[in-house]
Amino acid sequence: MSCARITVTLPYRSAKTSIQRGITHCPALLRPRFSACTPLASAVPLSSTPLINGDNSPLKNTHQHVEERSSKRREYLLEETARKLQRNDTESVEKLKLIDNIQRLGIGYYFEDAIDAVLRSPFSAEEEEDLFTAALRFRLLRHNGIQVTPEIFLKFKDERGEFDESDTLGLLSLYEASNLGVTGEEILEEAMEFAEPRLRRSLSELAAPLRSEVAQALDVPRHLRMARLEARRFIEQYGKQSDHDGDLLELAILDYNQVQAQHQSELTEITRWWKQLGLVEKLGFGRDRALECFMWTMGILPHPKYSSSRIESAKAAALLYVIDDIFDTYGKMDELILFTDAIRRWDLEAMEGLPEYMKICYMALYNTTNEICYRVLKDTGRIALPYLKSVWIETIEAYMVEVKWFSGGSAPKLEEYIENGASTVGAYMVLVHLFFLIGEGLTHQNVLFFKQKPYHKPFSAAGRIFRLWDDLGTSQEEEERGDMASSIRLFMKEYKLSTVEEARSCVLEEISRLWKDLNEGLISIKDALPLTIVKVALNIARTSQVVYKHEQHTYMLSVDNYVEALFFTPLLSS
């Protein structure tokens, strides 16, 4: 099979969009916004396409025929790939490379048991004689939640305590592995400090494609990348490699397109729900939110089998969007106090004293949350309402704290701002909803992880990273509207910094530190909680970086291209 021809190329650092749109404050979870004037919306108007309206009957027979044909081919390719993983005559390092390619291509979920068996199998010291292999194995083990010590890298240091800087592939592999470190793992900190500057210096001397691979790693290391975007990008890159596995590439393309079709179906359902809810029309403000909400939930929970969980969490996210608009723009102080009190009470009588527009929003939240809880009860037998209600109360109270800060003209302490902001961006709300919707590991002990405050370190780290990336991506626009409390300004104030650039550097350093806390989920709480919910926390941080890592003076960027590639543009092979 020849290499794939991909319609949309996806660099990690997006360029500025040609159309600048007005931005109003909204919870970070639900940015970016898309309007009818954007290039994407013009090409694929959500209000008129058969996909969104559910009127896809003319395409039904064609789709069914294509699905049947591709399904048979996919089954064959799955069997072939499984055989390659199970072969005993393949060198261990080649199996590690195969696993790495499978997971980067976005098809790892088909082979989870086989991958786990390979990674847990004995690996001799002779097979880890080179730095590249040792670092690759370390990264794969930790990425998949398997215990491994970084002490394995000590033997690669010379008498001066340094690694071999002439081994570019080894340094690149080591750098990628070092991004999975946790606090206290000094060997990984030293590895990153050694590898990063040397890789940067070597860029001009490297030949393609290694130069491109090193540049991408220095921009966004693999561990920090959003899974579906990485799959799409790597499918294109992998197809250009002279030694690529044609069957593996074909399987990745077939699967990408199949999952994309599934996402279109999910988006149709979310859009239909949102239109039936009629909240925007009844409130008289806000915009349609289905597309941007779903992009977030897909980034946070990409596995195809969690379709209903994505749909239900996107509904909760859309309501958070509306509530944020109320607190930030439309609500008066006395109304917001009443609304917060009504949320605390959580009963229909509590909304009697609310203005009409708040009653509508309250009823939508009340009914949607109860419907989600009914689904959880039906699917898992667990009662989720006390926990979902609690996280909504926590989130609304956090909004109220921000309103009091801004209305009183007082600046919070940096730590206070970041922790409160982890709630207002919606990180904890999403974590709690998805924990119950996914339904894995719903034991009494595990539920306690979501009752204790502050939240467990990896969950708190995910929310804080989200908050900080939001500030990096939107602080200028928010300051122009008069919202002066952001982590950037608070860093400047508390650390007596003279420039915004210095403060932004401090924010990025804090994000790097928080990733070490987040990585602890892979080696600690995963022994209690299922790895799936740990990966939800990781994906919250990854998706926020995709959305907000752009030129600091622009918020709306070509994320539109990401959305079009993820949901509307299939991969083509030739």
Swiss-Prot record:
Keyword Magnesium found: yes
Residues that coordinate or bind Mg(2+) 2: D324, D328
Residues binding (2E)-geranyl diphosphate: R287, D324, D328, R467, D470
Disordered: region residues: 52-71
GO cellular component: chloroplast
Necessary cofactors: Mg(2+); Mn(2+)
Bias type Polar residues, positions: 52-61
Pathway: Secondary metabolite biosynthesis; terpenoid biosynthesis
GO biological process assignments: diterpenoid biosynthetic process
Intracellular or extracellular location(s): Plastid, Chloroplast
Family: Belongs to the terpene synthase family. Tpsb subfamily.
Protein name, UniProt field: R-linalool synthase, chloroplastic
Organism: Ocimum basilicum (Sweet basil)
